[in-house]
């Protein structure tokens, strides 16, 4: 199991991905839970682990109507940091990409590698 610090550091630097199939209303419930109170990075990490375990246990099927799905949501941590969760669907309705990255004023927080890529372009 990854430590909390390693998880947050990696998420802030690289993001992460995993395969998941889950309907939109679960995210709505999760979003409202988070918006009602501030979460520490530790709590965010624990919720993320719980969500992963729940998805692995259920293996829920995606429905045909893509419009019933969101493409991302924000989570605010108690230290003022915000995290953006994003995901996308493949043509066969499988939810394939699920990313987490830190945001500043609604924009992705730039890492050193992002800056170097921008300069090289």
Question: Positions of the model-derived regions?
Answer:
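Ribonuclease/tRNase effector modules and their secretory precursors
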Residues: 1-121
């Amino acid at each position: 199991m990854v430590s909390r610090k390693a998880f947050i550091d990696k998420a802030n630097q690289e993001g992460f991905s995993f395969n998941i199939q889950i309907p939109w209303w679960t995210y709505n419930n999760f979003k409202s839970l988070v918006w009602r109170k501030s979460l520490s990075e530790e709590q965010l990490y624990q919720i993320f682990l719980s969500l992963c375990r729940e998805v692995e246990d259920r293996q829920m099927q995606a429905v045909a109507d893509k419009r019933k799905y969101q493409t991302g949501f924000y989570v605010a941590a108690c230290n003022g940091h915000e995290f953006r969760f994003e995901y996308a669907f493949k043509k066969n309705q499988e939810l394939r990409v699920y990313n987490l990255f830190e945001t500043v004023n609604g924009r992705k927080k730039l890492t050193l590698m992002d800056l170097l890529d921008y300069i090289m372009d």
